[in-house]
């Protein structure tokens, strides 16, 4: 039985051993004899979490993902950023200008009355979903996704840029141990980025790798600046974050990279996630992703987010989360590059 289709009723119809065997085959999991029993126990504990959350009949469906054999602590250590996101400088706020209008003039009229839904994947501004592997390099994927979209809207061809260059060569950030998109933007402004084809990703097993200087001599992408889209710092004392302003910025300037508390994403399968217990402060954000769109489904507003855990996770690599409540800090740290 396909794991993607395993809901609570389906799980009750098959033995735990069969479910475990299907999981291992689906995700090509192998363990030592000593490790097998402990991984099975963790898997069973996650099944209980999945069943409990799905019984609540929310707007999301939790299920067996490739991370179902990990504890929450292991998941964070292997796939999220372990370095606190300590900001060292304030960023200038977005000035509200429609910088993307050079490619889509009609976007200027949308700011007065934004549509109920918009998706940049349908307008050519988003490259295919990528895979960071067991490396806390999400910040580099958030950065490249943001720059890819901004340059596309500035009338360049959509080009997949090199995360590996940032992971290995950006000395301000910490490679597989985490980083900040704004520091990465600073690197891109000074050094530029080559394409993914020129400098392919190799850090999937957790090694940042040394900078291959010979591969970064012909950059194809630069940015001129970067801005803060939503409130941060003293703004956190406000009752609400400016998610409506984020909509305007998204439409006007393309996909936006954000920080998020990714703890609820470990067992996410599909639907609009509405986590009850996740962090919203800057210090609690442990993952970087790319907002590519928004919409409303059955009365529930959501953000559509491009993740970097390959297409075998979530909705073909994408994640949807409730919009308007700053869930998991989606509006706590939204930053954006400027072409």
Describe each region flagged by the PLM:
Residues 2-339:
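Catalytic-core signature of thiol
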């Amino acid at each position: 039985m396909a794991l993607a289709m395993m809901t609570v009723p389906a799980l009750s119809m098959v033995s735990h051993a069969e479910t475990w065997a299907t999981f291992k085959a689906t995700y090509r999991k192998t363990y030592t004899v000593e490790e097998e029993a402990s991984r099975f126990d963790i898997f069973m504990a996650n099944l209980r979490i999945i069943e409990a959350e799905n019984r609540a009949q929310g707007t999301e469906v939790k299920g067996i993902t490739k991370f179902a054999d990990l504890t929450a602590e292991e998941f964070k250590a292997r796939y999220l950023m372990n370095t606190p996101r300590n900001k060292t400088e304030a960023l200038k706020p977005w000035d509200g200008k429609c910088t993307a209008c050079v490619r889509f003039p009609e976007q200027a009229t949308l700011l007065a009355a934004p549509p109920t839904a918009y998706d940049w994947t349908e307008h050519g501004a988003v490259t295919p979903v990528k895979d960071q592997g067991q490396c806390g390099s999400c910040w580099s994927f958030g950065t490249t996704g943001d720059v890819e979209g901004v340059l596309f809207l500035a009338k360049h061809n959509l080009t997949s840029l090199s995360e590996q260059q940032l992971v290995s060569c950006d000395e301000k950030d910490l490679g597989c141990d985490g980083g900040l998109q704004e520091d990465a933007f600073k690197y891109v402004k000074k050094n530029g980025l080559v394409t993914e084809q020129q400098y392919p990703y190799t850090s999937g097993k957790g090694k940042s790798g040394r900078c291959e200087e010979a591969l970064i001599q012909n950059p194809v992408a630069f940015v001129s600046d970067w801005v803060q889209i939503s409130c941060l710092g003293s703004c956190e004392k406000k009752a609400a974050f400016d998610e409506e302003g984020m909509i305007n910025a998204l439409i006007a300037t393309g996909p936006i990279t954000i920080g998020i508390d990714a703890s609820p994403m470990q067992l996410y399968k599909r639907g609009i996630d509405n986590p009850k217990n996740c962090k919203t402060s800057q210090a609690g954000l442990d993952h970087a992703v790319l907002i590519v769109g928004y919409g409303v489904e059955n009365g529930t507003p959501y953000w559509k987010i491009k993740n970097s855990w390959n297409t075998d996770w979530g909705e073909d690599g994408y994640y949807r989360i409730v919009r308007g409540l700053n869930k998991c800090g989606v509006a706590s740290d939204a930053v954006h590059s400027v072409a």
